[in-house]
Design a protein with these regions (language model features):
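A C-terminal junction/extension of Radical SAM enzymes
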Residues: 151-283, 321-341
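Pocket-edge positions in alpha/beta enzyme catalytic cores
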Residues: 35-39, 70, 292
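Canonical Radical SAM [4Fe-4S] cluster-binding loop centered on the CxxxCxxC motif
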Residues: 1-46, 280-282
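Short, solvent-exposed loop/turn segments at secondary-structure junctions
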Residues: 9-11, 25-26, 72-73, 99-100, ...
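Radical SAM/AdoMet-radical enzyme domain recognition
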Residues: 41-68, 75-200
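Short, flexible loop segments at the rims of nucleotide/cofactor-binding pockets, characterized by
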Residues: 70-71, 255
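Flexible mid-to-C-terminal extensions adjoining Fe-S/redox cofactors in radical SAM and related proteins
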Residues: 24, 28, 276-277, 282-343
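Hydrophobic pocket-lining residues within nucleotide cofactor-binding pockets
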Residues: 5, 72, 295
Length: 343
């Protein structure tokens, strides 16, 4: 998958159009000028042309392109940008917080247009704005497209249970039998989670995962609608943007990210608006220093050379991270510059 940042603004303060928004924190050192907040179509075209000429990136794009940010729907050019990246892949998705005031919003109109062009909209559920903003528009989205991924970012198991119940109530209200498999999946998720909470409320992460058993996180419905839910633990992040080694729901466990790039396989590449690339799945952190070239500035040959150099650097750093975890030095940054939780 290619995860491409198309917008720096996170719409934390202004929900409909970008006037007084702040920049998504990990991008602050990179995008100081307001003019750089939105990716422009010309930049997208240049990226697309370069991706076509670099086989590893071309292969990742064919699998999936995820347009993200910040809040991707804030970009006034997002429909045109979607069309450009659609020439690379039949599977282009856009992630949104769906914190939108109404169907009259330009942001909403952009999302609708993307679904009409066969793009997919995925969301992160936010309970604080669920009833007033997300729920009414999600009803529309599930009629406009044939699938949905919902991310649940949880601070505790009780918080996760509340969010699962929100989804159960939502799909129970839909007067369509095709969503019954989704309810069956969510009911099973809820039952297993409740058992864990009742029997071991302060459980370790392994206990939580064992309680979930072999439960899949996705299901197919009659008519082809595919639903997936991702439960993602939340982390404390310092004002400097450094993430804790432990998650909020599982404070006793060092949270490890098993990076495939360390093992010589790139399954995801995150591309910033500046063109900088990192094979990092943790797009909320972006602190991995080994870079894989600049998609806008570097030649295909230079990029492929940097791929090899940075993979070796990451493998060395991951090895040191593992040793640090064994010797009570977890959290110490190594000279290779990969985050201390990446192995």
């Amino acid at each position: 998958m290619l995860s491409i940042f198309v917008e720096a603004s996170c719409n934390r303060y202004v929900r409909d159009e970008c006037r007084f928004c702040h920049v998504y924190p990990p991008l602050k050192p990179i995008l100081g000028s307001r003019e750089d907040w939105h990716m422009m179509p010309d930049t997208a075209r240049l990226m697309a042309e370069k991706i076509r000429s670099i086989v590893p990136l071309k292969d990742l794009a064919k699998k999936e392109i995820n347009l993200t940010g910040g809040e991707a729907s804030q970009n006034p050019h997002i429909v045109e940008i979607y069309k450009i990246f659609r020439t690379l892949s039949g599977n282009v998705r856009l992630h949104t917080n769906l914190d939108i005031s109404s169907e009259k919003s330009k942001r909403w109109e952009r999302l609708v247009e993307i679904t009409r062009l066969r793009g997919r909209i995925d969301i992160t559920l936010y309970p604080t704005v669920w009833e007033s903003r997300q729920q009414p528009l999600l009803r529309k989205i599930i009629q406009l497209q044939n699938g949905l991924i919902v991310n649940l970012i949880y601070e505790s198991l009780a918080d996760l249970l509340r969010q699962i119940n929100i989804l159960i109530d939502f799909f129970s209200d839909q007067d369509e039998k095709k969503f019954i498999p989704i309810l069956e999946l969510l009911d099973l998720f809820r039952d297993r989670l409740k058992t864990t909470i009742e029997t071991n409320p302060q459980c370790r992460e392994d206990d939580f995962l064992n309680g979930m058993g072999d439960l899949e996180n996705y299901v197919s419905c009659p008519g082809g609608f595919v639903f997936a839910v991702n439960a993602i633990p939340s982390f404390y992040v310092s004002p400097e943007g450094i993430r804790d080694m432990t998650s909020l729901p599982f404070p006793k466990d060092v949270y490890k990210v098993e990076c495939t790039a360390v093992r010589g396989v790139i399954e995801i590449m995150t591309v910033l608006q500046t063109g900088e690339m990192t094979p990092c799945c943790d797009v909320g952190n972006l602190k991995c220093k080994p870079k894989f070239g600049n998609l806008l500035a570097d030649s295909p040959e230079t990029i492929l050379q940097k791929f090899g150099e940075s993979q070796k650097l990451m493998a060395s750093g991951a090895s040191k991270n593992i040793e640090n975890m064994k010797t009570d030095k977890a959290g110490k940054w190594v000279e290779e510059g990969i985050p201390p939780f990446c192995v």
